[in-house]
């Protein structure tokens, strides 16, 4: 095996890491360790003190504990797919869009999802998030995916966060005419085999457990 992946099924950061790993790696390349966030395993804390998933511990001893870096590592293992998912002429623009997702949009998303913990109400944070969502909607108006008619790294990196936003109030999101293309884009990922392959449920990892191979 190439290493160990500490993951949490519903975390959008972990989701996007798993998406890239499933696409790029041969089956059974990694050991998957499902983490319970309220009881994180000491083995993970020892290698990544920031204590967030995902964490990839490579056989060489290298630790990669940022999801986007895990995605890029996965792509480096499959250079042919990397050329398809990260077209050179879109590389900088894709990086900027992913950074906006991980920055301002994620800030608003967290507060929208847990508005009772913050200063303003749900609608306030939903409105804050809408600028980014409308930017995605515009991109999808004349093409199937965010940068062209084929999936790129940006789609894989951003989709789990749009999914999380939509699920805060699914009925409201699906009724919004302003997000028609975004709804279709999201539905395609949610209904696809790739997403199903990364969302299998696993028991929380314990040291005495038999290793779970990933991708399956």
Task: Identify what each model region corresponds to.
Residues 40-43, 81, 141-142, 147, ...:
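Glycine-rich, flexible loop/turn motifs
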Residues 1-130, 137:
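GST-like domain detector, emphasizing the conserved glutathione-binding G-site
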Residues 202-216:
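Acidic/histidine-enriched, glycine/proline-rich intrinsically disordered or flexible terminal extensions
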Residues 20, 192-195, 202:
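A structural signal for the main folded, soluble domain(s) of proteins
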Residues 73, 168, 198:
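Residues that scaffold the ATP/ADP-binding catalytic core of kinase and kinase-like folds
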Residues 83, 196-199:
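Acidic/polar loop patches that form or flank catalytic/metal-binding clefts of enzymes
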Residues 93-191:
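GST-like fold's C-terminal all-alpha helical module
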Residues 77-81, 168, 192:
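Phosphate/oxyanion-binding loops and surfaces in catalytic or ligand/nucleic-acid-binding neighborhoods
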